[in-house]
Amino acid sequence: MNEQSQAKSPEALRAMVAGTLANFQHPTLKHNLTTLKALHHVAWMDDTLHVELVMPFVWHSAFEELKEQCSAELLRITGAKAIDWKLSHNIATLKRVKNQPGINGVKNIIAVSSGKGGVGKSSTAVNLALALAAEGAKVGILDADIYGPSIPTMLGAENQRPTSPDGTHMAPIMSHGLATNSIGYLVTDDNAMVWRGPMASKALMQMLQETLWPDLDYLVLDMPPGTGDIQLTLAQNIQVTGAVVVTTPQDIALIDAKKGIVMFEKVEVPVLGIVENMSVHICSNCGHHEPIFGTGGAEKLAEKYHTQLLGQMPLHISLREDLDKGTPTVISRPESEFTAIYRQLADRVAAQLYWQGEVIPGEISFRAV
């Protein structure tokens, strides 16, 4: 065997690729890709290097960065004329709060919460869910805001009504690729839900447990705003894997965001991090950026409570217009800078969920090479 053919042997190729991947650093990686055992397959065919990764959390946006940073080096050391990259996902199922049993078909539940209303929690939740789906996951969203359900309107599905195939369970409403359910599908817009906390909590638990969810990697839970009895009850009884707290940079919002973090800590729900919504206002005429609600608030809050600042979302008229039309930005403007930010947020949320959690043995395994 000559030196050139030996360099292209399966063992040598895999070692070259693994060595290059080990040097790739990214905010979503606590350990490198080689340690993560993400390298699934390496092959050589017709002067083309074929590389396949299998990740336990959604990673598409970071994968694009990987290709940009590593392709030139791999072409140089292998002598390949081209690289065929492939990314697959085998999403991990992570242990839930107090090892509670999960919802049938649902691997992980991500609660999106805020200490107060009006900070953009629901808009963040719906775009996060769509971004997770765009990154390659199977995703659902449950509108847990019993008193102010807005997810049906944001998804353009407000006129749909759920069906019951067996007279007991509800089939989810499919919208933009998401499996969804909401009290908003069951009541009219002008019908106020005048329920006490225990009744509202019971209704939500029924919606969660009696919906015929398809197999989902992530179920996003749009929590009611606040930190009162209903929020505490939900946090204690729903099989949540991790929570995201949404706030604005404004001091008054940050005060209530602190309460949300403390609430989740008390019920032992891992806080994945903080999303700073309306971080800056972007003028639709000139593009000027202005931090109308202040700066640095969420970053300081994350430092104080030893958690992550997962993302900073801007305030722009197009984001509001897209939601009002029932086609959120991730769907209506897939190539926009705003969608790119949401997809990066999805990667970071999914990665943080994985690194903070513990994989349930037997529910996920990497495919053998």
Residue ranges, per PLM feature:
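N-proximal, solvent-exposed amphipathic alpha-helical segments enriched in charged/polar residues
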Residues: 2-40
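Extreme N-terminal, non-catalytic leader segments
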Residues: 35-38, 45, 52-113, 357
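Walker A/P-loop phosphate-binding motif and the immediately C-terminal alpha-helix
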Residues: 109-143, 261
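Phosphate-binding loop that captures ATP/GTP phosphates
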Residues: 132, 136-195, 201-202, 208
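Phosphate-binding/switch loop-helix module in NTP-utilizing enzymes
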Residues: 187-234
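Conserved catalytic-core segment of NTP-binding enzymes
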Residues: 217-218, 224-325
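C-terminal boundary of histidine-terminating zinc-finger modules
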Residues: 325-336
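A short, charged, Gly/Pro-tolerant segment at domain boundaries
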Residues: 344, 348, 357-369
